[in-house]
A protein has these predicted regions:
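Residues within membrane-spanning alpha-helices of integral membrane proteins
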Residues: 147, 166-169
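N-terminal, Lys/Arg- and Ser/Thr-rich interaction peptides
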Residues: 21-39
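Polar-ligand-bearing catalytic/cofactor-coordination segments
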Residues: 2, 6-20, 37-140, 174-190
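Short, electropositive, low-hydrophobicity segments enriched in small/polar residues
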Residues: 121, 157, 169
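Alpha-helical transmembrane segments of multi-pass membrane proteins
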Residues: 29-35, 153, 168-180
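Helix-coil boundary and interhelical linker segments in multi-pass alpha-helical membrane proteins
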Residues: 14-22, 154-164
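Alpha-helical membrane association modules
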Residues: 161-167, 181, 189
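Post-HExxH zinc-binding segment in Zn-dependent metallohydrolases
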Residues: 136-159
């Protein structure tokens, strides 16, 4: 009887053991990421109810800043979604989300100006932006695979999968660290 129980304990341990160190590393990082995203959304929502006295849209502000910097070839386009705004250096396009493009709020104007800051960085060959753009493909792959790999590794007690998932997650963290100076600089240029 005891030998049979020992056998089932081994199987349970083999398939369902979760190393607490993984939780100590992953859970805080995930919580920080979620809190940061929640704060961005909360701040945007708060200031999206404060409107510009000039009454011009975020798209118009973006076009004005681009023109003032001689970037006449950069287009401003609308993109679906909320807070999906970005500058695409391959197409030379500033894309503003539905919640930003036609809005006259100071939040939308700030987002549009920030994205134009990236276009200015691109035009002036800002080195950290070049580095960031070079590592984006690897980081995108890591962001899509990290959490599923970690979960699969924990469920099937496959430590190599967990380690690969943690490595992919670490690449995302490095990307965010490289991105911080680029983001601050884009806001300052705006």
């Amino acid at each position: 009887m005891r030998e049979e129980l020992f056998y089932w304990e081994e199987i349970f341990y083999m398939f369902w053991y979760i190393d607490p160190y993984y939780f100590m590393l992953i859970v805080p990082a995930m919580l920080i990421a979620l809190l940061a995203q929640a704060r961005v959304s909360s701040t945007f929502n708060r200031y999206s109810r404060v409107y510009s006295h000039r009454g011009i849209t975020a798209a118009q502000v973006a076009r004005n800043i681009l023109d003032e910097n001689g970037l006449y070839d950069v287009q401003v386009q609308r993109v679906a979604g909320s807070l999906t705004d970005h500058y695409d250096p391959r197409s030379n396009v500033v894309r503003l989300s539905d919640s930003v493009y036609t809005s006259t709020s100071i939040a939308a104007i700030g987002v549009a100006a920030h994205e134009v800051g990236h276009a200015i960085q691109h035009a002036t060959d800002y080195a950290p932006l070049t580095l960031r753009n070079a590592i984006i493909p690897v980081t995108n792959l890591g962001s899509r695979l990290s959490i599923p790999l970690i979960i699969a590794g924990l469920l099937f007690s496959a430590q190599p999968l967990v380690q690969i998932g943690i490595l992919a997650f670490s690449l995302m963290v490095v990307f965010q660290l490289v991105t911080l100076p680029v983001e601050f600089n884009a806001s300052n240029r705006a």
